[in-house]
A protein has these predicted regions:
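Ligand-binding clefts/hinges and TM-proximal coupling segments of bilobed small-molecule sensing domains
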Residues: 130-147, 152-159, 242-276
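Short, well-ordered beta-strand elements
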Residues: 23-33, 51-57, 125-127
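A conserved helix-loop-strand patch within extracytoplasmic ligand-binding domains
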Residues: 96-149
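A bilobed periplasmic-binding-protein/Venus flytrap-type ligand-binding module shared by bacterial periplasmic
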Residues: 106-118, 224-238
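Ligand-binding "clamshell"
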Residues: 86-100, 113-116, 189, 194, ...
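Alpha-to-beta junction loops
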Residues: 69-79, 125, 148, 170-173, ...
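Short helix-initiation/N-cap motifs at beta->coil->alpha
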Residues: 56-66, 156-185
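Pocket-flanking alpha-helical
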Residues: 61-93, 201-204
C-alpha cells in the first residue's frame, strides 16, 4: 500500500512539474501588434494561473517558426494558417508545428504609395507585393478583386500564383516583389503597396481606415487566414496551452483586437458576457 501511495505521489509531483514546466517561464515569440500586445494584456492573468510569461518581440517573423521547432521558445504568435501550412510543407517531420489558439483575422489591403487613390492608376504604375509564396498569391488575388489584373481561372487562396501567372494586365502594372517587412518603407518608390496586417500596424496603417481596397471581414480570406498561436505537436494538449485559451478568449482581448483594426474570430464565453 505504501508503495502504491509513493507511486501516486510521484506521478502527482511529475504532473505538477510538467504543468508548470519545472518552474521555467512560458516563452513565446511574437510580432508586435496585436500579437505581443495581446500577450502583454494577459500576462497578469497567466501569472494568476501560475505561469510566468516571457515575450520576445521581433519584427522579422521568418525566424519565429524555426525558433519554435528548435525548442528555443515554447510557442509563437504571428502567423495565419496558410503560412503555417507552407512552413510545414518545407521542413522535416521533427520540425512540424500545429495551431492551438485561434484569435483574429488581419485584412491585407492596398495602400497608397505615391498615389492616394486607385482612381489615379495609370499605365505602367508599380505596385509592391510580398514575395513569400502564400502572401504573394493572396496579394495578387486582392489586386484581381480590385479589378487591376486577371489571374488564371480557378485561382484560389490555396494557389501559388506569381506575377508570371497574370493573364491580363490592362494597366501594364509593374509588380515589384519585396520582403513583406520592407514594403511599408518602400511606399515612396511605388504607386501602391499591398501590405499584410502585421506590417501595416508597425507603421500605424489600419486596413479599413487607410487601405484603398481591403479584404472584407466576411470574405473567404477572413476564414482562411485566421491568426493562430503555434506550438510543437507534443505540446498541443499541455495545460499551459489551455491556460492561454482561457485568458485570451476574453472580452478585453476581443476589444483590443477590434481597437487594433482587426477582426476577432472567437466568441467571448457567455459567462463572462453575462457578468458584465
Amino acid at each position: 500500500m505504501k508503495k502504491i501511495l509513493a507511486i501516486v505521489l510521484t506521478l502527482a509531483l511529475s504532473l505538477s512539474l510538467t504543468s508548470a514546466f519545472a518552474g521555467e517561464p512560458l516563452t513565446i515569440i511574437a510580432t508586435e501588434n496585436p500579437h505581443a500586445e495581446v500577450l502583454e494584456l494577459v500576462k497578469d492573468d497567466l501569472a494568476a494561473l501560475g505561469y510566468d510569461l516571457e515575450i520576445t518581440v521581433v519584427s522579422d517573423y521568418v525566424v519565429e517558426n524555426p525558433a519554435t521547432s528548435a525548442g528555443d521558445v515554447m510557442a509563437n504568435f504571428f502567423q495565419h494558417l496558410p503560412y503555417l501550412a507552407g512552413y510545414n510543407a518545407e521542413v522535416s517531420e521533427e520540425e512540424q508545428l500545429v495551431p492551438v489558439v485561434y484569435t483574429h483575422f488581419e485584412p491585407m489591403a492596398i495602400y497608397s504609395g505615391t498615389k492616394t487613390s486607385l482612381d489615379d492608376i495609370a499605365d505602367g504604375d508599380a505596385i509592391a507585393v510580398p514575395n513569400d509564396p502564400v502572401n504573394e498569391n493572396r496579394a495578387l488575388l486582392l489586386l484581381q478583386a480590385a479589378g487591376l489584373i486577371t489571374l488564371p481561372e480557378g485561382t484560389t487562396l490555396e494557389s501559388t500564383c506569381t506575377p508570371a501567372d497574370i493573364v491580363d494586365n490592362p494597366y501594364n502594372l509593374t509588380i515589384q516583389e519585396l520582403n513583406a517587412e520592407l514594403i511599408p518603407g518602400a511606399r515612396a518608390d511605388v504607386a501602391y503597396a499591398v501590405i499584410n496586417g502585421n506590417n501595416a500596424t508597425l507603421v500605424d496603417l489600419v486596413p479599413y481606415v487607410d487601405g484603398l481596397y481591403a479584404e472584407t471581414a466576411d470574405s473567404e480570406a477572413a476564414e482562411a487566414y485566421v491568426n493562430v498561436i503555434v506550438v510543437k505537436p507534443e505540446n498541443a494538449e499541455a495545460e499551459w496551452v489551455k491556460a492561454l485559451e482561457q485568458v485570451i478568449y476574453t472580452q478585453k482581448v476581443y476589444d483590443l483586437i477590434v481597437d487594433s483594426g482587426f477582426a476577432p474570430t472567437f466568441e467571448v464565453p457567455a459567462a463572462e458576457t453575462a457578468a458584465e
